[in-house]
Design a protein with these regions (language model features):
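Residue-level signal for the membrane-embedded core of alpha-helical transmembrane segments
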Residues: 59, 113, 205-208, 272, ...
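12-transmembrane solute porter fold
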Residues: 6-22, 27-29, 50, 243-445
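Hydrophobic transmembrane-helix bundles of small-molecule transporters
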Residues: 158-262, 269, 288, 294-295, ...
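Short, intrinsically disordered terminal tails adjacent to the first/last structured region
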Residues: 447-451
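Small-residue hotspots
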Residues: 87, 103, 110, 176, ...
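Transmembrane-helix bundle of Major Facilitator Superfamily
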Residues: 1-182, 309, 316-317, 324-331, ...
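Residue-level signal for alpha-helical transmembrane segments in multi-pass membrane proteins
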Residues: 90, 175-183, 209-212, 230-237, ...
């Protein structure tokens, strides 16, 4: 039976990793107020504060994972937590648009340090027999934190003011830091290497071009094509350098590909939904923010239930069928959600939110565990960074598509909100197809070796 230290370490890592999705979604319910403070329409404010957060996060994931391989996952995690606290304090103490944008960038960069290195710590610090359970709880925590973010943000905004959303991060991060410092083992064996700055800059330009191509009232094909070309050049470069920021050979493992696709397209739908709902009910139904946050509790609780169930289902019916079943439940939940015309109050969509939350919580953990176990332990940082990159890229793309469909007017219409649903369906279809890349049994894949 795992010792007490192991469970305390797991608790610290989970608290740390939850900060990243909380930072991106806790302001969802408060966006109308924040947009008014910034004197912008809600769509533009969402792109700047949420899309920008996700953009910086996704750019930093792979380099941060590589940095953790070099300096140690604990040190990288400590740096991330410290910067996250500093950015949160700035956002709370200084009430200006410029400082708010700077603090969000700091929090985004910090979240990029936190997530891959938290995941890598699970891979390297916990017994291998405990990993499926640990990644199940890890995935459930990330999903639940993203879903509970609007609930927490709504309550803080209702009873205090929107800057209180940032203050809560400080004691949260301090508790996580204390648990990890006390319980983690030193990372004795570190890989000798360096962070390739040229590759890092190239990756930043590639992802930045892709993201910026979806900002505005229409897609900028020049930026999108430029981003694809730069990303292709980045991959070509990584296959030829001695110390890649991310090793594309990981995608030789079908389980890793499935983990990446499930993470990316699952987050595409989840993030867009979390930010669509407050805008829909405020603009179209004139509902108070606190009522919207309360309805999202259904998604939160079902995600928390789906995570642990993932490991159980994986043992009983295998990884492939667990992931496939979860994808089908998710699609059925979306079918129920598509009847937005009948949703007069947030409580009307509790059932579809609960189904989609449970399905998301059930699919992600078992697939991520399979993907991480397919990669050598000493490359856990890079592997986790790659999956985190796909997670945030999916979320950022979801936010961008949502903003494109809702337009730049000060208020939105029912028809605009309905026009987003086919994009959700397409994303969930890719999640379903990814399940067929997984092995039927839950035996881990053989880790890849260097070519």
């Amino acid at each position: 039976m795992p010792e007490k230290r192991t469970f305390l370490l797991l608790a610290g890592v989970l608290l740390a990793s939850a900060l990243a999705p909380l930072g991106s979604t806790s302001i969802a319910v408060a966006m109308p107020q924040i947009a008014a403070f910034m004197e912008m329409d809600p769509g533009t404010a969402t792109q700047l504060l949420v899309g920008g957060y996700l953009l910086i996060s996704v750019i930093g994931q792979a380099p941060a994972g590589k940095l953790g391989d070099i300096i140690g996952y604990q040190k990288a995690l400590y740096i991330g937590l410290a910067v996250f606290m500093l950015g949160s304090l700035l956002a709370y103490l200084v009430r200006s648009i410029e400082v708010l944008l700077i603090s969000r960038m700091m929090m985004a960069a910090a979240s990029a340090m936190i997530v891959p290195n938290a995941s890598a710590m699970l891979r390297t610090q916990l017994p291998e027999s405990m990993l499926p359970f640990a990644y199940g709880i890890f995935g459930a925590t990330m999903g639940a934190a993203a879903a509970v973010g609007p609930l927490l943000g709504g309550a803080l905004t209702q009873f205090f003011d929107w800057p209180a959303i940032f203050l809560i991060n400080v004691p949260w991060a301090l508790l996580a830091l204390g648990l990890i410092v006390i319980t983690s083992k030193p990372q004795i064996e570190k890989r000798k290497g360096r962070l390739d700055l040229r590759s890092t800059v190239l990756l930043a330009f590639a992802i930045g071009a892709l993201q910026l191509g979806f900002i505005g009232d229409s897609v900028d094909l020049r930026l999108v094509v430029s981003g694809v070309l730069l990303l292709s050049f980045f991959i070509w470069m990584q296959l030829r350098v001695d110390e890649p920021v991310f090793d594309p050979r990981f995608f030789k493992q079908p389980a890793y590909v499935a983990a990446g696709f499930t993470t990316a397209f699952g987050n595409f739908t989840m993030y867009a939904l979390l930010f669509q709902l407050p805008i829909f009910f405020v603009d179209v139904r004139q509902v108070a923010e606190i009522e919207i946050a309360g309805a999202l509790t259904a998604m939160t609780l079902s995600m928390m239930l789906g995570g642990p169930m993932s490991a159980v289902a994986g043992r009983l019916i295998g990884i492939r069928y667990t992931a496939g079943l979860a994808a089908c439940v998710n699609i059925f939940g979306l079918y129920l959600y598509s009847d937005l015309e009948s949703a007069l109050v947030p409580m009307d969509i509790i059932a579809p939110l609960a189904l989609m939350g449970f399905a998301g919580g059930m699919a992600g953990p078992v697939v991520q565990a399979a993907g991480m176990l397919a990669i050598e332990k000493d490359k856990a940082g890079m592997a986790a960074g790659g999956l985190s990159t796909m997670r945030y890229l999916g979320g950022a793309l979801g936010i961008s598509i949502l903003s494109l469909r809702l337009g730049s007017e000060s208020t939105t219409t029912l028809e605009q909100h309905l026009s987003v649903i086919p994009y959700y369906l397409g994303a969930l279809f890719f999640v379903l197809m990814s399940a067929f890349l997984l092995p039927v049994s839950n035996k881990k894949a053989d880790p890849i070796e260097d070519s």
